[in-house]
Amino acid sequence: MNRGSLFLIAALSIASLLIAFFATCFGTISINQMEAWRQWLSLPTSEWDQQTRILALRLPRIVLAWLAGGALATAGAVMQTLLRNSLATPFTLGIASAGSFGAFLVLAMPGLAIFGSMSSPLYSLLASLLCLLLVLKISNRSNRADGLLLAGITLNFLFGAGVMLVRYLADPFQLASMERWMLGSVNAVNINTATAPLPWIAIGLAFILPRISALDQLAFDEEIAAARGVPVKRYKTQLLLASGLLTAGVVAYTGPIGFVGLLVPHAVRWFTGLRHGALIPACFFSGGIFMILADLVARTTEIAGRNSELPIGIVTAIVGGPFFLLLLIRKN
């Protein structure tokens, strides 16, 4: 990694921390940040004023937005390399549809909620991991070069059909909860909820980071990588599982927030090039920045006088849609 790449990663890491810090100031109600932080760090909860309580509500969602954005952007970069498809996203293999199906089962059938408030994220996570394992199993049995992609698309349709069936059978109250889930949210209740995806993100990154040089070789040519001693099949399976864990861990707690895993890796490549040693860390920090800013727009935007925030999934789609069209035009 050259000096310019190191400087870029350092700048992005500092920028992400500064943006996260200052994002706590803004919302429908502005606060005196320094006073709120002073009380939050030095006074017991019972002595906090309104500003500090608002800070305590905003901080978990900023943490969750940073983790979710970083994980989805990293997973998107890995998926684009492994599938050799610049339009691949973390949701290409059906993980988001499977996660939504698992969460919707709990919302539609409260009897399944045996784990309390953690039931919906847990079922979502299990369904996502099941989808990922099925994709790998089916693709390993296929002799087609595009077997992995086709298996993912097929399961995406199947779980999507399951989602539509559950929504059709749900009552209006359950349907409203499902709609909120589909729009995505980083509205974490507390810091424990905000950091709940962290173990899955840590496991995913622990598999990806030691294999960055292998990603460079896989991106160039798999046959040459195999000739150089890279265990191509094993590494591809491990990296797919890692990116799946990143995605599943996030979707279970935020719902499917689109375009982050597509937009951020392409934007970062304009500055880092194709080397994954710079691309992966830069994607993580840039994804965190993008998601924090999207959440900031979401919670400061009021539409048609409604006393509610704009769903973050709508914000990312508004930004990501035109970028997607631009990417298609450039590819043509």
Language model: regions and residue ranges:
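Alpha-helical transmembrane segments in inner-membrane proteins
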Residues: M1-N332
